[in-house]
Design a protein with these regions (language model features):
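Structured core elements
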Residues: 8-10, 17-19, 39, 96-98, ...
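Glycine-rich phosphate-binding P-loop
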Residues: 12-41
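P-loop NTPase nucleotide-binding/switch module
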Residues: 1-13
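Conserved NTP phosphate-binding and transfer environment spanning the P-loop NTPase/kinase superfamily
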Residues: 94-176
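Conserved nucleotide-sensing/catalytic segment adjacent to the nucleotide-binding pocket
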Residues: 39-98
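A generic local secondary-structure boundary/capping motif
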Residues: 5-8, 29, 83-87
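Solvent-exposed alpha-helical segments within well-ordered globular domains of core cellular machineries
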Residues: 7, 31-32, 140, 144
Length: 176
């Protein structure tokens, strides 16, 4: 068992850990996801346990379960505000999303061919770094990243499929 700093939500069946520096907008992002129908698993501290060395299960410490700290508001009881569907006791971790200032990302991914991983307890989990900027709807971007991961779990990788179509078009038309 280990702990990680961040927030964890269930986005349409995909367990997502949202992480980032203090003040990066993690909680605002997670609140936006909950408003869209996601379920809170953990806020601030996520406890992970490995299952057979191949998957991670995340949960909240009992003392903070179903609560979030929101700057300027304080501690909120998520299911009391958003309903019982907004909470989840535990969830498998499928995706890690790091919210980062644009200048702190070495190479911002534009196509999706390079696959990053985040390791916890020796298990590597798909990892996406999203640049944070004023006016960006981070909840929407995290939701899209989660749904893209869901597609990948069914064998559909948008970036690889796009590259294959592009290469086929180039070879058929002789475009250099």
């Amino acid at each position: 068992v280990t702990s990680e700093h961040g927030c964890m939500v269930d986005v349409q069946g995909i367990g997502v850990m949202v992480r980032g520096d203090s003040g990066s907008g993690k909680r605002e992002c997670v609140l936006g996801l909950i408003e869209r129908g996601a379920s809170l698993v953990a806020d601030d501290i996520i406890k992970y346990r490995a299952i057979e060395g191949r998957e991670l299960i995340g949960m909240s410490p009992v003392t903070g379960r179903f609560h979030m700290e929101v700057r300027g508001i304080g501690i909120i009881n998520v299911p009391a505000i958003f309903g019982v569907a907004s909470m989840r006791v535990e969830k498998r971790l499928d995706l890690v999303v790091s919210l980062k200032a644009t200048d702190k990302i070495d190479n911002i991914e534009r196509v999706g061919i390079r696959k990053k991983k985040y390791e916890i307890l020796g298990i590597k989990v798909p990892h996406v770094e999203l640049p944070v900027a004023a006016g960006r709807d981070m909840a929407s971007l995290v939701e899209v990243a989660a749904l893209d991961q869901k597609l990948k779990s069914f064998g559909h990788d948008s970036a690889i499929e796009f590259e294959a179509k592009l290469l086929k078009t180039i070879s058929e038309k002789g475009i250099n």
